[in-house]
Amino acid sequence: MSRISKSEMSRLLSVYFIMGSNNCTKDPLQVLREALEGGITIFQFREKGEGALTEEKRICFAKELQAICKEYGVPFIVNDDVELALELDADGVHVGQDDEGITSVREKMGDKIVGVSTHTIEEARWAIENGADYLGVGPIFPTSTKKDTKAVQGTKGLAHFREQGITIPIVGIGGISIENTASVIEAGADGVSVISAISLAESAYESTKRLVEEVSNSL
């Protein structure tokens, strides 16, 4: 197995759904299934914060979500937990700046997908040099889902990464909705990552379909 190509990674980032059990008011397994039917291209398991599952329940829930992703042939990424990603044989892992360092993550994950959240050009260059396959850049807009977010960057912050010669695939993160998706793609992102735009939507399926349309119309 070799590392994922840049073009394939870019394609997979189009509509990147992130979810944990505490991000939904409906059955999360049904929400994920609807999102997959609607056309999400990659999924990240992020079981964190108030009311999140722990220990064995967390692992069992992750396995259920992973099995659904497999049915649809969509990559299953684990947030922040390299050991869990390895235990599940997940397709990859996504780490932040305060998590395990990219060098040791890449070493442990082999050729699997490794994504890194970055907020500065320096962080981006370090991540690229040490084996990141894609960057999560943000928060682009204010968000209520994450309590520990950095300063909002806006689409200008995202465009700055491209202006500084960062060519690796980028997914925009933070406060992204159907209404502002086009501006994120136009600023230079390959895709958008969302939590509540799908997880709290009246119809996860319809919301995902609209996100897919917005991205494809803007690329």
From Swiss-Prot:
Signal sequence annotation: none
Reactions the enzyme catalyzes: 2-[(2R,5Z)-2-carboxy-4-methylthiazol-5(2H)-ylidene]ethyl phosphate + 4-amino-2-methyl-5-(diphosphooxymethyl)pyrimidine + 2 H(+) = thiamine phosphate + CO2 + diphosphate; 2-(2-carboxy-4-methylthiazol-5-yl)ethyl phosphate + 4-amino-2-methyl-5-(diphosphooxymethyl)pyrimidine + 2 H(+) = thiamine phosphate + CO2 + diphosphate; 4-methyl-5-(2-phosphooxyethyl)-thiazole + 4-amino-2-methyl-5-(diphosphooxymethyl)pyrimidine + H(+) = thiamine phosphate + diphosphate
Protein family: Belongs to the thiamine-phosphate synthase family.
Note describing how the cofactor binds: Binds 1 Mg(2+) ion per subunit.
Molecular functions (GO terms): magnesium ion binding; thiamine-phosphate diphosphorylase activity
A Pfam family of this chain: TMP-TENI
HAMAP family from the UniProt entry: TMP_synthase
InterPro entries (alphabetical): Aldolase_TIM, ThiamineP_synth_sf, ThiamineP_synth_TenI, TMP_synthase
PANTHER family the UniProt entry points to: THIAMINE-PHOSPHATE PYROPHOSPHORYLASE, THIAMINE-PHOSPHATE SYNTHASE
Keywords: Magnesium, Metal-binding, Thiamine biosynthesis, Transferase
Record pathway: Cofactor biosynthesis; thiamine diphosphate biosynthesis; thiamine phosphate from 4-amino-2-methyl-5-diphosphomethylpyrimidine and 4-methyl-5-(2-phosphoethyl)-thiazole: step 1/1
Species whose genome carries this gene: Bacillus cereus (strain AH187)
Entry binding sites for Mg(2+): D80, D99
GO cellular component: cytoplasm
Protein name: Thiamine-phosphate synthase
Binding site for 4-amino-2-methyl-5-(diphosphooxymethyl)pyrimidine: Q44, F45, R46, E47, K48, N79, S117, K146
Keyword Metal-binding (UniProt): yes
Obligatory cofactor(s): Mg(2+)
One Gene Ontology term from the biological process aspect of the record: thiamine biosynthetic process
This enzyme's EC code(s): 2.5.1.3
Functional note: Condenses 4-methyl-5-(beta-hydroxyethyl)thiazole monophosphate (THZ-P) and 2-methyl-4-amino-5-hydroxymethyl pyrimidine pyrophosphate (HMP-PP) to form thiamine monophosphate (TMP).
Binding site residues for 2-[(2R,5Z)-2-carboxy-4-methylthiazol-5(2H)-ylidene]ethyl phosphate: T143, S144, T145, G175, I195, S196
